[in-house]
A protein has these predicted regions:
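Glycine-rich beta->alpha junctions and the first turn(s) of the following alpha-helix
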Residues: 129-231, 271, 312-385
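A short core secondary-structure module
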Residues: 85-130
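Internal helix-loop-helix
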Residues: 1-45, 49-54, 97-104, 227, ...
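A glycine-biased, small/acidic residue-tolerant capping/turn segment at secondary-structure junctions
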Residues: 248-250, 282-307
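A structural signal for short hydrophobic beta-strand segments in well-ordered beta-sheet cores
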Residues: 76-80
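C-terminal helix-coil-helix/basic helical segment that borders enzyme active sites and/or dimer interfaces
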Residues: 228-276, 289-290
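A short, Trp-centered hydrophobic/proline-enriched beta-strand micro-motif
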Residues: 54-62
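Glycine-rich phosphate/pyrophosphate-binding beta-alpha loops
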Residues: 67-68, 94-100, 176, 312-317
Length: 385
C-alpha cells in the first residue's frame, strides 16, 4: 500500500492531464474506497483485483437532481424483495464522473424510505441504464453521465457494510476525495506560476522583458505566496493523517474501517484543504492568464483550458460554500464535546488580549506572534458568535 503522503504527491503531479486526473481520482478514491474500507471479503475478492488492474473502471453515484450537497436526502429508493435475495432500486443520479465508462458503481439509496445505504452495482444490471454524456465547460476528456434505475435488480449481497450506514461510507470517502482535490489544485497553481513566469521572461514590451515590470512581479509573487500557503496546509495535514493511520494495527480485521474512520477525524482539515486549495488555484490561474494577456485567452495556450478545467473544483466534492459550513459545524460540535480544547483556550483569551503575545527575539518571532494573535482573535470571535 502506498502511504497517504505519496498519494498526495501523485495527485499533485497528475494535474498535467486534468481529465485523466479526474478519472484516476475516482478510480483510486471514492469509486473504490467504499469497497476497500467497508466491503466484505467476498466483495473485495470479486471486484478489487479487476479494479486495481484497470480491467474495471469505477464510479460513485451520490448526487441526484434534487439533492447535491445534502446527499442524505436522496430520493433513490431500495426495497428488499420478499425472498430477500435482491434490492430493487428506483431513481436517478446525475453528474457522475466515469459514469459513461464505468463497469462497477457504488450507489447510494434509501432503504425503507429513510435508511441511507450503499450498494455495488455492475454495468449491465437488469433495470440499470446510463444516460447521455454531459456537455461540460471543462474536463472535456472525462466522462460525466446520468445513472438511471428503473426497478434495477441488485443482489442482496451487494449491500455495502450495513443498512443505514451510507452516510458513514459516503462522507469518510469524501474526506479523502476533498483532500486529493486540494492536491490537484496545488499542482494546477504551480503549473500556472511556471507558465506565467516563463511567458513574462520571454515577452518583450517597451524595450525590455515584462518580468521586470513591478506589476508583473507583484502578480507572480502573490501567486507564489498563496500557493506556498496551500502547499504547507496540504502536507501538514497529510502528515498528521498518516501519523494517525500508522497507529492502526494492520493485522486487525477491521483495519480499513478504522482507516476510513481516521479520515473522519480530519474532516475539518480536509474541507479546509479543498476550499483553500480550489480558491487558490482559481485565483492563481486567473492571474496567470492575465500575465499572458491576449494570448492567455487563446485555447492554444495552456492557461485557457486550465481556466475552464479548474472552475469545477469549487463545486464538486461539496461546494466550497457547503464545505465552509462543514468546517464551522464540526468545530462547534468538537467544541461542545471537548474533543477540541476550546474551553481551556478561551479561558486564556482575556490575559492574552490584555498582555499581548510573549514575543522573543528568535528567528520568525514576529511572524509567530502574528499567527498566535490571529488564532486568539479567531477563537474570540468564534466564542462570541
Amino acid at each position: 500500500d502506498l502511504d497517504k503522503i505519496t498519494t498526495a504527491i501523485v495527485a499533485e503531479a497528475l494535474v498535467q492531464s486534468p481529465s485523466f486526473a479526474v478519472t484516476w481520482a475516482v478510480q483510486t478514491g471514492i469509486g473504490s474506497l467504499p469497497i476497500i474500507w467497508f466491503g466484505t471479503d467476498e466483495q473485495k475478492n470479486k471486484y478489487l483485483p479487476k479494479v486495481s488492474s484497470g480491467e474495471f473502471v469505477c464510479a460513485y453515484g451520490l448526487t441526484e437532481p434534487s439533492s447535491g450537497s445534502d446527499a442524505t436526502q436522496a430520493k433513490t429508493s431500495a426495497k428488499l424483495t420478499e425472498d430477500k435475495k435482491h434490492y430493487i432500486l428506483n431513481g436517478e443520479k446525475v453528474f457522475i464522473t466515469n459514469g459513461g465508462i464505468a463497469d462497477v458503481f457504488v450507489v447510494f439509496a434509501q432503504v425503507d424510505g429513510n435508511k441511507f445505504s450503499a450498494f455495488i452495482l455492475e454495468k449491465g444490471t437488469e433495470g440499470f441504464s446510463i444516460g447521455r454524456e454531459e456537455n461540460k465547460l471543462g474536463m472535456k476528456g472525462s466522462s460525466t453521465a446520468q445513472l438511471i434505475f428503473q426497478d434495477a435488480k441488485v443482489p442482496a449481497e451487494n449491500l455495502l457494510y450495513k443498512v443505514g450506514k451510507g452516510a458513514t461510507i459516503a462522507f469518510n470517502c469524501l474526506n479523502i476525495g476533498r483532500f486529493k482535490l486540494g492536491c490537484s489544485c496545488l499542482g494546477g497553481s504551480k503549473q500556472a506560476i511556471t507558465t506565467a513566469s516563463q511567458y513574462a521572461l520571454d515577452r518583450k514590451a517597451f524595450g525590455s522583458s515584462i518580468s521586470k515590470f513591478d506589476a508583473i512581479q507583484k502578480k507572480i509573487a502573490e501567486m507564489a505566496i498563496l500557493t506556498f500557503a496551500t502547499d504547507s496546509m496540504i502536507y501538514r495535514t497529510i502528515g498528521l493523517l498518516q501519523d494517525e493511520i500508522d497507529l492502526i494495527d494492520k493485522d486487525t480485521p477491521d483495519y480499513y474501517i478504522q482507516m476510513g474512520e481516521a479520515m473522519g477525524k480530519y474532516a475539518i482539515e480536509t474541507s479546509m484543504v479543498k476550499v483553500f486549495g480550489s480558491d487558490c488555484s482559481h485565483w492563481v490561474i486567473d492571474q496567470g492568464l492575465q500575465v499572458l494577456a491576449g494570448y492567455g485567452y487563446l485555447e492554444e495556450y495552456s492557461l485557457a483550458p486550465a481556466y475552464r478545467d479548474d472552475r469545477i473544483n469549487q463545486i464538486w466534492e461539496g461546494t466550497n460554500e457547503i464545505n465552509r459550513q462543514i468546517i464551522t459545524g464540526f468545530m462547534m460540535k468538537k467544541a461542545l464535546t471537548e474533543e477540541l480544547p476550546f474551553r481551556d483556550a478561551i479561558r486564556n483569551i482575556d490575559s492574552f488580549l490584555n498582555e499581548g503575545p510573549s514575543s522573543d527575539n528568535s528567528e520568525f518571532g514576529k511572524e509567530f506572534d502574528s499567527v498566535e494573535t490571529a488564532k486568539k482573535l479567531g477563537l474570540y470571535l468564534f466564542n462570541e458568535s
